[in-house]
Amino acid sequence: MSRSIKKGVFLHKSLFLKIKNNKLENIKTWSRNSTIIPDMIGININIHNGKLFKKVFIVEDMIGCKLGEFSFTRKFKSHSKKIKRKKK
């Protein structure tokens, strides 16, 4: 379900202030639900995934997405494949 247009996008207040003040430095944030806005283009943002901070460089294609979409919280682990052996 999408967010109402009259409410606008969500951006954490402290994250917004850091973007306005520090244009070129790395910004560390725990706010995964903040929306990427055009002012963020070209900034490195360290997004917390619950254990570590993952460094993400913001580009134009990311505008309108949430920060949490680029820092996965779960590690993908696949099952091992069976190896077919040649018969002698």
Swiss-Prot record:
Disulfide bonds: none annotated. Pfam families: Ribosomal_S19. Keywords: Ribonucleoprotein, Ribosomal protein, RNA-binding, rRNA-binding. It comes from the Bacteria. One of its GO terms (molecular function) is structural constituent of ribosome. GO terms for cellular component: cytoplasm; small ribosomal subunit. One of its GO terms (biological process) is translation. Protein S19 forms a complex with S13 that binds strongly to the 16S ribosomal RNA. Belongs to the universal ribosomal protein uS19 family. This is Small ribosomal subunit protein uS19.
